Amino acid sequence: MSSEPDAGEFHEMREPTVEKVVVHMGVGRGGEPLAQAEEILEEIVEQQPVRTTAQKTIQDFEVREGDPIGTKATLRGEDAEEFLETALPLADIDRKQFDETGNFSFGVEEHTEFPSQEYDPQIGIYGLDVTVNLVRPGYRVHKRDKVSRSIPSNHRLTAEDAVTFLESNFDVEVSE
């Protein structure tokens, strides 16, 4: 059952919303490139990013567990929706990018595609990954500590619901 009105069966508790948007830039190493990536990400999302660290050692990439290798920022509420209005036109969204619970991810190959950014030969070009988490009202029941319950299957978001939400609210066409 989708969130669209079906013969008068539409209910506001079935309307999907954007819970959060996570914007991530993986640099692969610390130092100056990571500092530049943090600065770029802060300009794009207008929020202070946090560093991400390597979860395990990979000798071939010369990365040790605990080394800072990337940066990310989590956007919620109006900030998340404003960012999506800017970022979604820069990406081609395909149905394969949606999971079975309605979440989706996409990449932006060059940070210079954002209106606030210009190419600087001293910095170079960085790409970024965007992950969008969609929920319906009532999903907190699953996450709360006391008396948590599972979400009924007829209330869970599907990929079809997420595509419909994206196309109607953000004016984006999702390709097959």
UniProtKB/Swiss-Prot annotation:
One of the record's GO molecular function terms: tRNA binding
Cellular compartments per GO CC: ribonucleoprotein complex; ribosome
InterPro entries: Ribosomal_uL5 (IPR002132), Ribosomal_uL5_arc (IPR022804), Ribosomal_uL5_C (IPR031309), Ribosomal_uL5_dom_sf (IPR022803), Ribosomal_uL5_N (IPR031310)
Keywords, comma-separated and alphabetical: Ribonucleoprotein, Ribosomal protein, RNA-binding, rRNA-binding, tRNA-binding
An individual GO BP term: translation
TM ranges: none
Pfam families cross-referenced by the UniProt entry: Ribosomal_L5, Ribosomal_L5_C
Superkingdom to which the source organism belongs: Archaea
Function: This is one of the proteins that bind and probably mediate the attachment of the 5S RNA into the large ribosomal subunit, where it forms part of the central protuberance. In the 70S ribosome it contacts protein S13 of the 30S subunit (bridge B1b), connecting the 2 subunits; this bridge is implicated in subunit movement. May contact the P site tRNA; the 5S rRNA and some of its associated proteins might help stabilize positioning of ribosome-bound tRNAs.
Quaternary assembly: Part of the 50S ribosomal subunit; contacts the 5S rRNA and probably tRNA. Forms a bridge to the 30S subunit in the 70S ribosome.
PANTHER family in UniProt: 60S RIBOSOMAL PROTEIN L11-RELATED (PTHR11994)
UniProt record similarity statement: Belongs to the universal ribosomal protein uL5 family.
Protein name as catalogued: Large ribosomal subunit protein uL5
Lineage: Archaea, Methanobacteriati, Methanobacteriota, Stenosarchaea group, Halobacteria
